[in-house]
Swiss-Prot record:
It is found in: Cell membrane; Endosome membrane; Cytoplasm, Cytoskeleton, Actin patch. Residues 249-267, 324-342, 374-383, 895-904, 1000-1016, 1089-1132, 1251-1268, 1352-1362 have a biased composition (Polar residues). Residues 155-190, 505-540 form the EF-hand domain. The lineage of its organism: Eukaryota, Fungi, Dikarya, Ascomycota, Saccharomycotina. The gene is PAN1. Component of the PAN1 actin cytoskeleton-regulatory complex required for the internalization of endosomes during actin-coupled endocytosis. The complex links the site of endocytosis to the cell membrane-associated actin cytoskeleton. Mediates uptake of external molecules and vacuolar degradation of plasma membrane proteins. Plays a role in the proper organization of the cell membrane-associated actin cytoskeleton and promotes its destabilization. It holds the Pfam family DUF1720. One of its GO terms (biological process) is unidimensional cell growth. One of its GO terms (cellular component) is cytoplasm. PANTHER family: DYNAMIN ASSOCIATED PROTEIN 160, ISOFORM D, EH DOMAIN. It is a peripheral membrane protein. One of its GO terms (molecular function) is calcium ion binding. This is Actin cytoskeleton-regulatory complex protein PAN1.
Length: 1396
């Protein structure tokens, strides 16, 4: 609060030698009583700087003019003293050269509202700056003042323009305080390098708007606005700056007594007339800055101690005012500046108080000075002090009863013609992405396109107009000049292509833009065309469509003018000169009397009343045409009128019909065009549906994108975090486990780094680094104490080191795991980005989808057609899907029928499959049918069936790769066991050798046919996808050829079979006769048995040589039976082997290795047709037959004789059972089929012949681990092994064994599993000795699972003597004395022959 009695001293360049007013000890001011009666001259009372101090000499008239010091303060009435008149000299007060003082506009009323986005300190600074920049009487800062302040930030003009657009919310061109604070805050953001927002945040905008509204509510209404246009407008208060208004100069003639003042009456040349007392102090004057001078110092008035006045500068550069000798000064505590005065040079005037002059609307207030706190202020004219270094300017005045104009809340209006360049209003909210676009399209800039799209945000901007704004035009012109290096005034197509492709738009969009811009088809663009192209690119980047033709706003002015000129020329050329509008010809010269021509019809003004009757009568006579409105019409006239009207009506009807026809025809034509368009659209939609649209719809993509976001942003990070936690926990647990192991081994060990003993002081009891350091210091102290006292600390450095290494190892492993997890997370992130890029859609696609897929934003008719098209498309897709499904179903069925027909042609009427070939064909047909059904259910169509359409006989080459069902395996093996007993004599070996070359060509021919068939089938496979009919014909042709070969082969086999059967029957009859003859005598029996051995060997040899083709039949049995029950894996492995010719070659050349490696696996048997005889094994076979053996077989050394060196003994047992089939057999647990077949061999010769045909199967099964021998003598072995198909088609197991075999699995690979009750057979040479003792061996039961044994010394000696003891030999057989211990390392009878 201001204290008027407190001295206010300012050391701003005052001159201490100057005193004004009273001296230090005087009560009166010095007066100069000269020039008492001189007239007053003009006195310069402005603030002239640096005037000399005039107190050092007398007042001179020529030393300038100035105001005499006046007494201030309250005192007694004093006599009037003469006042110096004339040129009052100015008084310098030492203000020259001082710095300007910044003053605040304290009249501003700014509400105390806090802006949240600005700190309190910054808001206070901004308010101070705003108050100093806003002049008095204003509430906002102008654009010029604001630009001067904002330019001090050092930012570019473009950035400041964006800041201004953001800050000037109401677009008034000036800023209120909240807007000004916002602009300064944005400047500080830009200075810090932060990006400016394109649109103000909602919170900031709401706060600024509410602040502005609060300021607008607090501004009082102007009284002059209220009094305007009313009768009381003259009573409106004058403005303080109205210096042209008449001034009251205090002249009062009839004043009875002067008022009580502290001033002495002054003589001013009018003796006896006193000046009105002036109060010149008591108010703190506002600081002003005229030039380099400082503000005036406040003066103290009133009674009390007399204080000298402060030095005041009263000179300046402001012109004086004509206001009389002394202008009334403002008194009281009102903050107003001293007014410049001009005194002198006027007619003699009375000073003092008088009434105001007429016509002045203000009265001078009477003042009481000295000691009174309430002083009335007086408005006087003058200049408002300026706060700058410019010349003072006049303040705008209201001159007359004009209504005050509002100067706030103006909206920026576009000026000029619509679309005219350079006159387009700037859009609000800034131009989005324009700065980024300017930087992106510069020549040397290689920024990625994604930055530009992210700046544009690819969203529709409402403030992106068609017209080009000034700022945009400047940016586009700058880009044009940057690319036009040679200053040609245009850019060619190559440069424009480089510029436009930087936008990242599609080729079709850029082509459309080029077509719109290059109107002259010159292949180059000038500056205006380049600007239009860039603006179209800019709009396209903001999500707008490219127009089909340029709008008027984008046509350059030069092009528009040229186009208008060309149009006018075309019109003139079309219509000729007569088409131009004719103007009245101008007179060549002024009309004169010589050229005057009188017009008699041109009367002057004639009154209508005077000639009314005459004119009406003339008109009635002239108008002879009757109308329907006449009242005196005759019948003829009425008929005539009716006829005329009828003609007119007919003409109107005809015209209406013509118009209707034309309209209907045009409408029909338009409808036809619309229908054609609809049909074309339907056809295109049909093509699209047929081609198929694999991409998901917009809604599906949005759903997938939402699911992707959920998985990648919620689920995956949580899983990664959990995995990290588990990984760290595993690392800790590993360290703990290792520590526990060490503690278990060393109970006295006390680990040093055991954190379990550390008491954590961190949050939630966690162990911090400080806790570890503290614990380590304690441990060190403990160790030192232990070293001093000699006690053990329980520590062990080695164990500690091991624990530390284990912990570090666990941590390293955990870190590696973490890196792997990070790599996985990075891979997931990459996949997420790829998926998001594929699933995300642009704004244009969404708008197009809503418009043309959902029917939004288009007319009702088009929307209706869109819905119809959608329904039509759905129906099309449904039909196409149904037809495709039917084709997929029909194709496998057709192939199944084809295959079935191929198979049924060869054996359709042979369902009973009396022969093995027929059975194989039937089984194969059934297998193919079931296979096709399964594949059809899985939706798989088999393109080529050539490998499966081969005749059943051709499958022998791949029989090793086919699984065999148990039932078929058992039946085939049973037959093999039944026939194997009838071993032929050794003398039949030449027969088999002779027959072997005859059979090999057949087998080779079959192999060749298979190879050729594979070639043909592969060729058909290649072309099957193109033409099914050709494939079908080729398959039929192959089928016919194979059937012909099959018939020929069957005829040959049947003929050979009949011959072999006849021979076998003869041999059987001879053998039967021998048995009957030798059964009477024991010696004769022995001789008979020896003979029968030879006979059976010969028979077996003959059977093997004759039954070679029948072995193929058994192979077909195995293959065809195995297919229906094989697994999918077996099927997949089956086809490559069957169609691969190299598998046959490998099988032909590697029989030995295959047999030895595969063991008991029947699926890997070779197809060799010539097998070399191993002489060592043959010799071992002969030795075994003769009874020469190294030991009884029960020694521990397994290396003395191997399983492969000893012959197969299973055939000997079967031979013995066949030879003695007529005798009573001991009860066994084997199936009855074996015994019955053995007992009825002699009676059922035809069945035995069939069983003989399958003999190689059993032989191969029994001897599949041997590369050379197969259970016969050496001669038989050679003849047998050289038979081509013997080792190929052997079934794996005999049929006589039930599926669950006996428990002991101790049979070797050489012998097939036999029933538990039948003892293992001895070697073949010991067979004769077993015949008479067979009944003796019935009572003793056999040992539980006796392994096969080698022949012992006893049997060999008996064989050598010639008359062996048969009973003793049979006892040895039943007792298992001659059996040797074997290692059961392959499989037992339960697994042989099963499907793996």
């Amino acid at each position: 609060m201001y204290n008027p009695y407190q001295q206010q001293q300012q050391g701003m360049g005052y001159n201490p030698q100057q005193q004004t007013g009273y001296g230090y000890n005087n009560y009166q001011m010095p007066q100069q009583p000269q020039f008492n009666q001189q007239p007053m001259y003009p006195q310069a009372t402005g603030f002239v700087p640096q005037q000399p101090n005039l107190y050092g000499s007398n007042f001179q008239t020529s030393g300038g003019s100035g105001m005499a010091p006046q007494q201030t303060g309250f005192s007694q009435q004093q006599t009037m003293q003469p006042q110096q008149t004339g040129y009052i000299q100015t008084q310098p007060t030492g203000f020259g050269g001082t710095a300007p003082i910044v003053t605040e506009n304290s009249e501003l009323k700014i509400p105390s509202i806090r802006l949240s986005f600005i700190s309190a300190e910054d808001q206070k600074k901004f308010e101070h700056l705003f108050r100093t920049a806003v002049p008095k009487g204003e509430q906002s800062i102008s654009g010029d003042s604001a630009s001067g302040i904002l330019l001090r930030s050092g930012l570019s003009a473009v950035t400041l323009a964006e800041i201004w657009n953001l800050s000037d919310i109401d677009k008034t061109g000036s800023l209120l305080f909240p807007e000004f604070a916002l602009s300064l805050h944005l400047c500080s953001m830009a200075k810090r390098g932060e990006p400016l927002p394109g649109i103000l945040p909602e919170k900031w905008l709401n706060e600024v708007r509410s602040f502005v509204d609060q300021i607008n509510f607090t501004v009082p209404d102007d009284p002059s606005k209220i009094l305007a246009n009313t009768p009381f407008a003259n009573f409106a208060p004058k403005k303080e700056s109205d210096w042209l208004a008449p001034q009251s100069t205090g002249y009062l003639q009839n004043q009875s007594a002067p008022p009580m003042t502290s001033f002495q009456p002054q003589v001013t040349g009018f003796g006896g007339q006193g000046l009105v007392s002036q109060a010149t102090g008591g108010v703190p004057m506002p600081s002003t800055t005229f030039g380099n001078a400082a503000g005036l110092t406040a003066q103290r008035t009133g009674g009390g101690t007399l204080i000298p006045l402060q030095p005041q500068q009263t000179a300046g550069l402001i012109p004086a005012q004509k206001t009389g000798p002394l202008n009334p000064q403002t008194t009281g505590f009102n903050q107003q500046s001293l007014q410049q005065q001009r005194t002198g040079g006027l007619p003699q005037q009375l000073t003092g108080y008088q009434g105001p002059p007429q016509g002045q609307g203000q009265q001078l207030q009477q003042q009481r000075t000295g000691g009174f706190p309430q002083v009335q202020s007086q408005p006087t004219g003058g200049f408002v002090p300026q706060t700058s270094f410019q010349q003072p300017q006049l303040v705008s005045q209201r001159t007359g009863p004009m209504q005050a104009q509002p100067t706030g809340s103006l909206q920026a209006q576009p000026t000029g013609r619509p679309g005219e360049w350079g006159f387009v209003s700037m859009p609000t909210g800034g131009i989005p992405g324009l700065n980024a676009m300017q930087q992106h399209f510069l020549p040397n800039n290689q920024l990625p396109t994604s930055n530009l799209h992210s700046a544009m945000d690819n969203k529709l901007k409402e403030n992106v107009t068609w017209a080009i704004t000034k700022q945009e035009k400047q940016i586009y012109d700058g880009l044009f000049q940057a690319w036009d290096n040679q200053k040609k005034g245009y850019v060619d197509s190559n440069v424009a292509l480089n510029v436009f492709t930087k936008s990242g738009l599609s080729r079709s969009d850029l082509e459309s833009i080029w077509t719109l811009v290059d109107t002259d088809d010159t292949g180059k663009l000038n500056k205006n065309q380049f600007a239009v192209a860039m603006h179209l690119i800019y709009r396209r980047l903001n999500g707008y469509d490219i127009p089909l033709r340029l709008p008027p706003e984008l046509i350059p002015p030069a092009d528009r003018t040229l186009k208008d000129t060309m149009d006018s020329l075309k019109n003139s050329l079309k219509g000729g000169v007569n088409n131009k509008p004719t103007k009245p010809p101008k007179p060549q010269s002024k009309p004169d009397g010589t050229r005057f021509k009188n017009d008699d019809n041109n009367f002057g003004y004639v009154s209508n009343v005077r000639h009314r009757r005459k004119s009406t009568s003339d008109e009635s006579h002239k108008s002879s045409v009757k109308s329907s409105s006449d009242y005196d019409l005759s019948i003829e006239d009425m008929k005539k009128l009716i006829h005329e009207k009828r003609i007119l009506l007919d003409a109107l009807d005809t015209e209406d019909q013509a118009n209707n026809y034309s309209r209907s025809s045009s409408s029909m034509h338009e409808k036809q065009i619309i229908e054609n368009l609809k049909k074309e659209i339907m056809a295109v939609q049909t093509k699209l549906d047929e081609r198929g649209n694999d991409g998901p719809s917009s809604d599906e993509r949005n759903k997938l994108l939402a699911t992707l976001d959920h998985l990648t942003r919620d689920v995956v990070p949580r899983l990664i975090s959990d995995i990290h936690k588990v990984n760290q926990e595993i690392s800790r647990k590993k360290a703990e486990v290792f520590k526990l192991e060490l503690l278990k081994k060393n109970p006295s060990w006390n680990p040093e780094d055991d954190e379990s003993q550390i008491q954590g002081t961190g949050p939630n009891g966690e162990v911090t680094d400080y806790d570890r350091i503290k614990y380590q210091s304690r441990q060190k102290l403990k160790q030192r104490m232990a070293a001093l006292t000699g006690k053990s600390t329980g520590g062990n450095s080695d164990l500690d080191l091991e624990l530390k290494q284990a912990t570090e190892k666990a941590q390293d492993e955990a870190s590696r795991q973490s890196e792997m997890i990070q790599d996985i997370a990075a891979g997931i992130k990459t996949m997420e980005d790829e998926c998001a890029a594929k699933l995300s859609s642009s704004v244009t696609e969404d708008v197009g989808h809503e418009k043309w897929e959902q029917g939004k934003g288009i007319s009702s008719e088009v929307a209706k057609f869109v819905k119809e098209l959608e329904a039509f498309s759905k129906e099309q897709r449904r039909n196409i899907a149904k037809s495709q499904k039917q084709e997929q179903t029909r194709e496998p069925l057709a192939k199944q029928q084809t295959n079935a027909s191929l198979v049924s042609d060869s054996g359709a009427a042979k369902s009973a499959y009396a022969t093995p070939e027929e059975r194989a064909a039937y089984i194969k047909q059934q297998a193919e049918k079931r296979m096709n059904e399964r594949l059809a259910k899985l939706g798989i169509t088999r393109k080529s069936k050539s490998t499966e359409q081969k005749p059943p006989v051709e499958s022998k080459s791949v029989s090793n790769h086919s699984p065999v069902p148990d039932s078929e395996v058992k039946s085939v093996t049973r037959n093999a066991n039944e026939v194997e007993v009838q071993k032929p004599k050794p003398d039949s070996q030449p027969v088999s050798k002779n027959r072997e070359p005859a059979e090999q060509p057949n087998s080779k021919a079959d192999t060749n046919s298979v190879g050729s068939q594979n070639v043909v089938s592969n060729t058909n496979d290649d072309t099957s996808g193109d033409d099914d009919d050709e494939e079908y014909k080729a398959i039929l042709k192959q089928k016919q050829e194979m059937e012909a070969r099959e018939r020929e082969r069957k005829l040959r086999k049947q003929k050979a079979k009949e011959e072999r059967l006849a021979k076998i029957k003869k041999e059987m009859e001879e053998m039967k006769k021998r048995e009957m003859e030798e059964s009477q005598d024991e010696e004769e029996e022995e001789a008979k048995q020896v003979t029968s051995v030879h006979v059976s060997r010969a028979q077996s040899s003959n059977a093997n040589s004759n039954v070679i083709p029948q072995q193929e039949t058994a192979t077909e049995n195995v293959n065809t039976v195995s297919q229906p029950t094989s697994t999918d894996t077996a099927k997949q492995s089956y086809h490559p082997h069957e169609s691969n010719p190299f598998s046959k070659m490998n099988n032909n050349t590697s029989q030995n290795s295959t047999v030895t490696n595969t063991g008991t696996n029947p699926f890997f048997k070779s197809t060799s047709q010539e097998t070399k005889i191993d002489p060592h094994k043959a010799e071992a076979q002969r030795a075994s037959q003769r009874g020469v053996a190294s030991s009884g077989g029960w020694s521990d050394s397994e290396e003395e004789e191997s399983e492969e060196e000893s012959p197969n003994r299973a055939g000997a047992a079967k031979l013995a059972s066949l030879l003695f089939g007529g005798m009573p057999q001991p009860p066994t647990t084997s199936s009855s089929s074996l015994n019955n077949d053995a007992e009825k061999v002699s009676e059922q010769e035809h069945e035995n012949a069939k069983q003989v045909a399958s003999t190689p199967l059993s032989n191969d099964d029994n001897g599949k681990t041997d590369s050379g021998p197969s259970g016969f003598a050496g001669e038989n072995e050679s003849s047998f092994s050289q038979a081509p198909p013997i080792p190929v088609d052997a079934p794996p197991a005999p049929n006589s064994i039930p599926p669950p075999p006996p428990p002991p699995p101790q049979f070797s690979n050489e012998a097939p599993p036999v029933p538990d009750s039948i003892p293992p057979p001895p070697p073949p040479p010991s067979v004769p000795s077993t015949v008479p003792a067979l009944p003796d061996s019935m009572p003793p039961p056999p040992p539980p699972p006796p392994p096969p044994a080698a022949p012992n010394n006893t049997s060999s000696s008996q064989q050598a003597s010639g008359a062996p003891n048969i009973g003793a030999l049979l006892g040895q057989i039943t007792g298992g004395a001659s059996l040797r211990k074997v290692e059961t390392k392959v499989s037992s009878g339960a697994t042989v022959g099963r499907v793996l």
